[in-house]
Amino acid sequence: MGQRMTAPAPDAVVIAIDGGGSKTDVLLVDASGAILGRTRGPGASPQVVGLNEGLDVFEQLVVDAAKQAGLPGRPPYGTHTAAYLAGADLPAEEEELVAALTERGWSPSIVVGNDTFAMLRAGTTDGVGVAVVCGAGINCVGVAADGRVHRFPALGKISGDWGGGFQLGSEALWWAVRAGDGRGPSTDLLPAIVAHFAAKDIFEVVERLHFENLPREAIHELCPLLFEVARAGDVVAQGVVKQLVDEIGTMVGTTIRKLEMAGEAPTIVLGGGVMTGVSRDVIDVIEQQCVEVAPRAEVRVVDIAPVVGAALLGLDAIGASTTAKTRLRTSAVGSVASGVVGQHPDGLVDGGAPGDPDGVGERAESFGAS
């Protein structure tokens, strides 16, 4: 029999952080699952803005949340910190962040992980399964029932990745430019992008990007436009969407095989702005590819704030009850969460999470190795 987990102290407080590329969300949650404070701030990935600068942003948000809760705005801010961050892609990065947060005295225990784990926990009752987050970038992680973990470095093209909103926007622009100068086939992406930026032609768009009259981030805006043009039947746009679908299917299939889950009924969680914005037919094709590898797989598109998953992982870590986790989900709906697309038989839409075990166990991580 497994070791029985000690119940958390009634005054235990979890500091949950979801640090994405565009925003940072913080929740303070007590051992009963009640939300004590919540704050949102700018994206401040330590890998982008620097370690101390990023942690300064996180800490101010934690202080603000603590003040909302009527707690002292000085460390320690809580019992346990669960920080799940975009850019925490390698063990060395996670260890550096844990050491820095420990030095700041945020809480007696601290866990740092990639934000894809928070999405997996938000979209499942037990943190077991496979998650793909496709937002600005793309990442995939898997956790087996025995705690084994498979993940990819997710460092972009240098680590073999393809996908994410910026990549898709770049592809849309690339095809539009080539249609404009004659090097590529005709595509409705060309007039759509010109109209989007209110330009006289596609070359004005290129010049504005080159001279930074348009910020580089504007390329990300083309991602929804790409899907619109594809839905209207444009062959070029459909080809880009197919490449994304195939990439997601490959990431999920590889993870399922590495974790030997093909004979099981794994939950596949799809999240991030790109996934929650696509049409059902795109999800259907992804689902078809997933069930080819694991016939009993269930694919879910989850539009829940990943910080809720971070908080659930924090409650797992302190040994909180199933009731506490259900309470958190219920409290989050309509305030932190923004709903779920698709069928969710375990009741994640209304906050119910029946049968929620106490956690996913010790994680033996692998990078492309079984």
Can you name each region flagged by the protein language model?
Residues 2-78, 102-103, 122-128, 174-370:
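ATP-binding/phosphotransfer module of carbohydrate and carboxylate kinases, centering on a glycine-rich
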Residues 78-87:
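Conserved beta-ketoacyl condensing-enzyme motif
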Residues 84, 113, 267-271:
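Solvent-exposed beta-strand sheet faces enriched in polar/charged residues
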Residues 86, 90, 165, 275, ...:
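Short beta->alpha junction loops/turns
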Residues 88-191, 325, 330, 337, ...:
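Phosphate-binding/catalytic loop of phosphoryl-transfer enzymes
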